[in-house]
C-alpha cells in the first residue's frame, strides 16, 4: 500500500487572528482529538476565565501560554485525511515571538495564512510581517483563511472586503494570488472547516 504524501503546514498571521483555535478545530473535526480531551481543555479554559480557548489549548500547552491567551513557542501535531498526511505547526503571531515563527516557517512546505474578518481587525501589523517572512523563506503555497466570520454575521461583503485587502498585500509581496484559495470560516464554531457551512451559502 503506497504511503500518503506528507506536508508540513504552518499557521501564520496576526496575534489573535485565531490560528491556534483553527488548528484545534481542524484536529477535532478530523478525529485527531477525542471528545474527552476537548472536554478537559474546556474545563481548564473555564478555570482560567478563557471560556472560548479550549481549541487553542490543544496546541497552547505551556502554563504561560494558557494564562496569557497567546502562543509563544511552536508546536507540532500530526493529522491525516484520506489522501494526505499533515504535520500542523502552530506558530505565534505576537511580534515578541517572531523568531519562533521563523523557526516554524523554516520547517514548513506551505502555510495556512489566517486573517480575522471581524470588523475593525482584518489586515494588521503582523499580518503584513508574516506574509513577507513567508515569501522570504520560500513558502509559496498559501491557503488564506478569513476567520471570525461569525463576528461579521457571515456577511459576503465583509469577506470580499478583507479578501481584496489581502489580495493587494500578497500581490505586492510577489505571490500569484490567482493560485491562492481564500476560505471564509468561523474556527471556533466549526463553520466551513471539515464541511461546507450553511451559514455562508454564497461561498462556493
Language-model segments: residues:
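P-loop NTPase switch module centered on the Walker A-proximal segment
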Residues: 2-99, 108-111, 115-118
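Conserved Switch II/interswitch segment of TRAFAC-class P-loop GTPases
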Residues: 6, 84-87, 91-97, 106-131, ...
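Flexible glycine-/small-residue-rich
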Residues: 11-13, 146, 184
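Acidic/polar active-site rim loop that often engages polyanionic ligands
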Residues: 20-23, 142-149, 190-193
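Alpha-helical scaffold elements adjacent to nucleotide-binding pockets in ATP/GTP-utilizing enzyme cores
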Residues: 22-26, 37-40, 100, 129-133, ...
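Canonical P-loop GTPase G-domain recognition
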Residues: 152-204
